[in-house]
Amino acid sequence: AAMGIEHINLAIAPALGPDGEAYLEAVQRQGWVITAGMMNYDYEDYSTLDTIKTTGGIAPDAHWPASGEAFAKAAQITARLGATAILMHVGFLDHADAAYAKKFYDRVRYLGDAAGEAGVTLLMETGQESAEDLQRFVETLKHPNVMLNFDPANLILYNKDEPLSAFRRLAPWVRHIHIKDALRTTTP
């Protein structure tokens, strides 16, 4: 707050580690309003578009159900901090692979249930999918505790959509927005 920053989107994963309580105490001393918690996993690899497609969010089987359990704890911490939402990149949506899609829907449903039990909403971050695919996903899922964090720069970085038209399509589910600069990738 001394720097004039009053509202933040807070990374929650550090609160799950061995120094978690010290982290939370330091955060609370700042007096910030936390607009949303944010969950990420140390196994996620954002170095290329291909690596994040296979390592992002809750998609990797090698890390499930531990990733879901960690999310549930993060949702509880988010609520404890007074925020009403926790956001994350849940992973790559792929409707073309029926088995993968079913697993993915089930996992996101689990996250939505865990968020609801904690009294917060899961906000899926836009990025690796078109607005049309994401709309299809949330309409099919129909979960009251699963909404969206709209990140227009991710749509540009992943070369998936035009931000304004994407926002118009997704607006009914948008509850939080990230703003940052981005350049469209030249290597998809």
PLM features per residue range, with description:
Residues 45-148:
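Active-site acidic/histidine proton-transfer and metal-coordination neighborhood
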Residues 27-44:
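Glycine-rich, aromatic-flanked loop segments that form ligand/cofactor-binding clefts
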Residues 42-47, 96, 182-188:
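Flexible glycine/acidic-rich beta-alpha junction loops that bind and position SAM and/or redox cofactors
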Residues 12-15, 41, 90, 174, ...:
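Residues that line or immediately flank small-molecule/substrate-binding pockets and catalytic motifs
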Residues 7-30, 89-96:
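Glycine-rich, proline-tolerant flexible connector loops at the mouths of alpha/beta enzymes
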Residues 1-2, 19-23, 63-77, 159-168:
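Short, acidic/polar
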Residues 7-8, 37, 105-188:
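Acidic/histidine-rich catalytic cores of soluble enzymes
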Residues 1-14, 74-77, 81-82:
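Catalytic domains of carbohydrate-active enzymes, especially glycoside hydrolases
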